[in-house]
Amino acid sequence: MYKKLYLIGILLLGLISGLTFNLIFFTVPYQLSEAKYTTDIVGSISLAAFPYCLKVIWSPFIDKYSIPFLGVKFGHRRGWALVSQIFLILTMMWFLKRSPCNNLCITAIILFIIAFCSSTQDIVLDAYRIERTTSKKELSIAFTFSSIGFRLGMLLGSVGALYSSIIFGWNTVYKFALFITMVGPIVILCIKEPELKTKRNTTNNLIDLQQYFEVIKKSIISFKNEQKYLLLIILFVFLYKAADSIPMAMSIPLFLDLSFTTHEIAVIYKAYGLLIMIVGGTLGGILAAKIGIFHSVLIGGVIQLLSPIMFMILATIGYDIKTFIITITIQNFCSGFAGTIISIYFASLCNSEFVATQYSISSSFSSLSRIILASLGGICAKHLTWPVFFLCNTLFSMLFIPIFYIYRKKLHFINYSKKI
């Protein structure tokens, strides 16, 4: 039992990841929407999260190079985790000194730095989960704990943010986020470094640019050799996430347009919705462990299509609490369910030599889908009615199905009929 306590640490670090993620994709966009900024501006602010899909550029350092002193004192993974946490806390302190609505350019820069620090932490956490687990089943459990923590972080950063903004103002919201983030270094110091069967080949010396690109090259070549249809995997992941990314990005502008109140959004969409998302994420992890990756990914992708369909129905009906609750239930369950499953799929694509880099490549595809589609969604929503917008979203998202069936073996679903 004691050996499994690291899962609590994974859950807490996932919570911090969810909190900082929510800052970019919900808290600041909500504040901008409340200040009557248009959907294209609200959608464009998500571009500040671009580091989430560029993690592969610096993940080789995290795989192969150890932080001086910290790497020796606390271990390779924990040393990197401490550095990312410290810089994340410092950037959050900077963010506290400014109002996001006053200068969008400065806001975007600060959010970009926060995204960089948070994505670096995610690289370390992803690698830690993979290296710390000893079986495929335990890997599924670890990803489930991380997913639950991530959703709890989103819950704190949404419901807590909305109610704090009403009672105390937005500055208190960001103080709350900073306080939660400060727990990160304590958690890192409490968990143990993964014990590897083979000695990790790392160094704490600075490397020149040629060596740096050589590490990236080896990582990508290694990944490419194992995944000969890498571009196909990229396309598949891009389409797979479309049914979740676009409704999530445009949800707040839609709800405010339909005259839902801050209280209704906080209680139904964020509090109730994120609890449903946790349930979905938990069931997704259990399903992947029971029936295997192939069938789990298919089921997750199909039920995920219900999200834009329900948003289209809600937009057509207008303000209606019952329809709103049904929409939130379906959207959040599907998001949690499919999100956990696709994370396990990413982990199955990695080998042991370049775990952090290869997982970063995989997860970057998902982040790229979310960020680009959120930005383009904001532009399209400005020129289309909400029902037409979500109808187009549904049709576009369905394209993953023929790719899945036609190229299922090339998408690394080898022995896909077997359990993981």
Swiss-Prot record:
Topology in the lipid bilayer: Multi-pass membrane protein
GO CC aspect terms: plasma membrane
Location of this chain's protein in the cell: Cell inner membrane
InterPro entries, per the entry: AmpG_permease/AT-1, MFS, MFS_dom, MFS_trans_sf
Keywords: Cell inner membrane, Cell membrane, Membrane, Transmembrane, Transmembrane helix, Transport
Pfam families in the cross-refs: MFS_1 (PF07690)
Major localization listed first in the record, in broad terms: membrane
Membrane-spanning intervals of the chain: 6-26, 41-61, 79-99, 104-124, 141-161, 166-186, 230-250, 274-294, 297-317, 324-344, 359-381, 386-406
Domain of life: Bacteria
Molecular-function annotations in GO: transmembrane transporter activity
Coiled-coil residue windows: none
Key word Cell inner membrane present: yes
PANTHER family hit by this protein: MAJOR FACILITATOR SUPERFAMILY DOMAIN-CONTAINING PROTEIN 3, SOLUTE CARRIER FAMILY 33 ACETYL-COA TRANSPORTER -RELATED
Family (UniProt): Belongs to the major facilitator superfamily.
UniProt name for this protein: Putative transporter AmpG 3
Taxonomy of the source species: Bacteria, Pseudomonadati, Pseudomonadota, Alphaproteobacteria, Rickettsiales
Gene from which the chain derives: ampG3
